Amino acid sequence: MKKQIVLIAILCYAAFAQAQEVFVTADFVSSYIWRGIDSGNASVQPSLGLNWKGLTVYAWGSTEFREKNNEIDLSLEYEYKNLTLYANNYFTQTEEEPFKYFNYNSHSTGHTFEVGAGYMLSEKFPLSVSWYTTFAGNDYRENGNRAWSSYCELSYPFSVKDV
């Protein structure tokens, strides 16, 4: 299984070698807030990805400076006009858990798989609405049934005095 994943990664890299844009970023944050939830202390959050004809593939991570809370996200996005489609794999590990990235057992994995869609009204009025739903991985109710957790976001970008 691991060999297949490595082979797929190599093939994807070769396919995107002619990418229009490769990006590498790193943020240092005093606290990690995700979708309004406190998800960690001071962290470094690097990312690596590439854009090609509306398709974006990237890896993003977060690791705390003091604790052993880590996150590795793999994401795929496709943008066409004002519509964006998302597929995300979030992997989290806490200090109490061993690092088992390749554990995909539905009730013990650190992975959460999510799909979503976002739509922006127009460039002149860039109000966006997005919806994401978890469909696999670590997302269960107390009774053991899949939770199908969903998140909706309404956003409008703005600046304050050219900041």
Annotate each language-model stretch with its function.
Residues 8, 13-15, 37, 65, ...:
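Residues embedded in well-ordered secondary-structure elements
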Residues 26-28, 46-52, 74-78, 115-119, ...:
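Residues on the lipid-exposed face of transmembrane beta-strands in outer-membrane beta-barrel proteins
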Residues 20-65:
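Short glycine/proline- and aromatic-enriched beta-strand/turn motifs that initiate or cap beta-hairpins
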Residues 135-137, 144-149, 155-159:
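Histidine/lysine/aspartate-rich catalytic loop segments that bind and position anionic ligands
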Residues 19-21, 54, 122-127, 158-163:
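Short loop/turn motifs that connect adjacent beta-strands in outer-membrane beta-barrel proteins
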